[in-house]
């Protein structure tokens, strides 16, 4: 209903402008036009509402209701508004409730039924701006030689969902995995490798990732406790950075082993992502320092090179520096992130030519990225009209409100968590089959359990406000009741059941007979028509939970519709009308679940 909303807003703005000019108050227009027309706070009030008359009362020095009467009179003279609106009613002290005409809603619903995208518009590229339509989403980003743990879950699925939404809108999306594949830790890892496999480094290819994690712990223990090992590790870092062939070989083997584990998890979660680790930006680090120096924003402080940040201070109230080169000449995460942001906004072939970059990390990195973005803007590496966003998220907690860990106090491996979700989903399914005295094949049970289990984990995360911490509970997320993936999947299965029972064939010619009268039909229509507005809002504020909340409300609305009106037993025209609503609900659900990275089922 976005097109209708935009047209309605445009016409209300024109009427507001006419009113202001008539009263010699034209200068107030820009301030008053903000949120001039909004979604109605309650369904019974109408489709939209306008509260501007309360503000106009202060300007015109009149009672708001008196102004509302004058404004509604002006609006009713607008032919475009008359074509769209059934009524403009004044309520309370001066609110204007807007109700759209039935035929306007029916035409819109017909259009969405026929649209494979359920009414979601494609972006229109602004050729005059010179900007590309490329969006980079930087997410997941595990570290080499470490297993992915539950902390990587949020970044991975939030980043994937945001990517899918931008792709649906028609953006060219580059999904980047900024893996931690470089740094001083590789000095100790390679030294340990050479100590253990001095005769044949290829032996590392036979090590499993779980062994590699223990290997990392053993390396760290030696580094912390053995001065001679520590010395050799630091020397190994220099060798690696200078391109020593043996060191590079060992580094590649470590990366390859980790990559196998990462890829297994990404395949299981249906995540598409391009690996481009920290090492990719190594050749650009020196030029980052040189460029900052050339632009006279680099300062040397106590031997380190840094840029002092505006509006950011330490506990003593002194300006905070973003250090980009350490006292010993080494670079850090900030240097790498600055090199990355510069490369990503640079025009091809020297960069990615992005118009927007979205970083999905935990909120603990908020200050880091605020500093990096500020320095990048000072250096003019973020072009005018381009956008950079940090998408922070909270912790995954246990039901006790503490950070989710194993009974032994260890961080939970992501692979184990996902396997447990599928196991529990299978357990629930087998119990349900037994209760229903129903037989299904092993293939059906395995596939259904996988889709429900993984879908439940994803949805439980995405349905939360990403900024807050959330408590992880298998019992809640696998429930068929409430705002859960199983509830949404069940609703979709219910619609599939209606279609399987239907022996009536209808086509596009039957569209002329579509008509709606029942209250539950109109509620479902209005809910379906809000889909495009939800997607556009996520494009702006990057909050996927908006889509989850919408889907839960849509399923509730559909299930009330299903319970209150017959579908297959009605006469032809009513049956066609209601089956079309079922089709559009199913299409909207499938498309939305796909945007959340959740597979769907025909039967459960």
From Swiss-Prot:
Primary localization: cytoplasm
Subcellular location: Cytoplasm
Coiled coil region boundaries: none
EC number: 6.1.1.19
Catalytic activity: tRNA(Arg) + L-arginine + ATP = L-arginyl-tRNA(Arg) + AMP + diphosphate
Cellular component terms (Gene Ontology): cytoplasm
Alphabetically ordered keywords of this record: Aminoacyl-tRNA synthetase, ATP-binding, Cytoplasm, Ligase, Nucleotide-binding, Protein biosynthesis
Xref: Pfam families: Arg_tRNA_synt_N, DALR_1, tRNA-synt_1d
Gene Ontology biological-process entries: arginyl-tRNA aminoacylation
SMART domains xrefs: Arg_tRNA_synt_N (SM01016), DALR_1 (SM00836)
GO terms, molecular function: arginine-tRNA ligase activity; ATP binding
Keyword Cytoplasm: yes
Family of this protein: Belongs to the class-I aminoacyl-tRNA synthetase family.
Subunit note: Monomer.
The name this protein goes by in its record: Arginine--tRNA ligase
Organism of origin: Prochlorococcus marinus (strain MIT 9312)
Gene: argS
């Amino acid at each position: 209903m976005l097109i209708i909303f935009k047209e309605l807003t445009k016409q209300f703005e024109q009427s507001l402008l006419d009113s202001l000019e008539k009263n010699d108050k034209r200068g107030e227009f820009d301030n008053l036009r903000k949120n001039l027309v909004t979604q109605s706070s309650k369904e019974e009030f109408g489709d939209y509402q306008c509260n501007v008359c309360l503000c106009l009362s202060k300007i015109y020095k009149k009672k708001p209701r008196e102004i509302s009467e004058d404004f509604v009179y002006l609006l009713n003279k607008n032919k475009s508004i008359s074509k769209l609106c059934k009524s403009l009613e004044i309520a309370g002290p001066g609110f204007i409730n807007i109700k759209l005409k039935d035929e306007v809603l029916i035409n819109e619903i017909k259009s969405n039924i026929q649209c494979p995208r359920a009414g979601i518009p494609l972006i229109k590229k602004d050729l005059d701006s010179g900007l590309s339509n490329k969006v980079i989403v930087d997410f997941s980003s595990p570290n080499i030689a470490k297993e992915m743990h539950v902390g990587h879950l949020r970044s991975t699925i939030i980043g994937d969902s945001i990517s899918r939404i931008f792709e649906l809108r028609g953006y060219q999306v580059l999904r980047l995995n900024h893996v931690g594949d470089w740094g001083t830790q590789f000095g100790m890892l390679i030294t340990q490798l050479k100590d253990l496999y001095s005769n044949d480094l290829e032996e590392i290819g036979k090590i499993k990732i779980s062994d590699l994690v223990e290997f990392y712990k053993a390396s760290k223990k030696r580094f912390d406790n053995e001065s001679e090992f520590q010395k050799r590790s630091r020397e190994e870092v220099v060798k690696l950075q200078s391109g020593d062939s043996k060191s590079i070989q060992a580094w590649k083997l470590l990366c390859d082993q980790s990559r196998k584990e990462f890829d297994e998890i990404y395949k299981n979660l249906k995540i598409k992502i391009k690996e481009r680790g920290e090492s990719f930006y190594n050749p650009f680090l020196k030029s980052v320092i040189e460029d900052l120096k050339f632009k006279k924003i680099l300062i040397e402080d106590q031997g380190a090179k840094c840029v002092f940040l505006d509006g950011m201070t330490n506990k003593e109230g002194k300006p905070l520096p973003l250090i980009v080169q350490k006292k010993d000449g080494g670079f850090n995460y900030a240097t790498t992130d600055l090199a990355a942001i510069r490369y990503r906004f640079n025009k091809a072939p020297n960069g990615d030519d992005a118009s927007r970059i979205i970083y999905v990390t935990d909120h603990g990195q908020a200050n880091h990225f605020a500093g990096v973005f500020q320095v990048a803007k000072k250096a003019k590496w973020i072009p005018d009209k381009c956008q950079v966003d940090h998408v922070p998220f909270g912790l995954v907690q246990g039901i006790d409100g503490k950070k989710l860990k194993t009974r032994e106090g260890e961080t939970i491996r992501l692979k184990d968590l996902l396997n447990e979700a599928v196991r529990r989903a299978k357990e629930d399914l087998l119990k349900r089959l037994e209760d229903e005295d129903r037989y299904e094949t092993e293939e059906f049970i395995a596939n259904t359990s996988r889709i429900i289990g993984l879908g439940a984990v994803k949805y439980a995360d995405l349905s939360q406000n990403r900024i807050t911490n959330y408590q992880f509970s298998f019992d809640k997320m696998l429930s068929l009741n409430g705002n859960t993936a199983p509830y949404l999947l069940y609703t979709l299965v219910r619609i599939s059941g209606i279609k399987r029972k239907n022996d009536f064939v209808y086509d596009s010619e039957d569209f002329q007979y579509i008509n709606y009268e029942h209250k539950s039909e109109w509620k479902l229509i209005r809910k379906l028509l809000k889909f495009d507005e939800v997607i556009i809002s996520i494009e702006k504020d990057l909050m996927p939970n908006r889509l989850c909340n919408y889907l839960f409300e849509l399923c509730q609305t559909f299930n009330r519709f299903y319970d209150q009106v017959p579908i297959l037993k009605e006469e032809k025209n009513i049956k066609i009308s209601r089956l079309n609503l079922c089709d559009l609900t199913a299409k909207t659900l499938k498309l939305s679940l796909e945007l959340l990275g959740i597979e769907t089922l025909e039967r459960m």
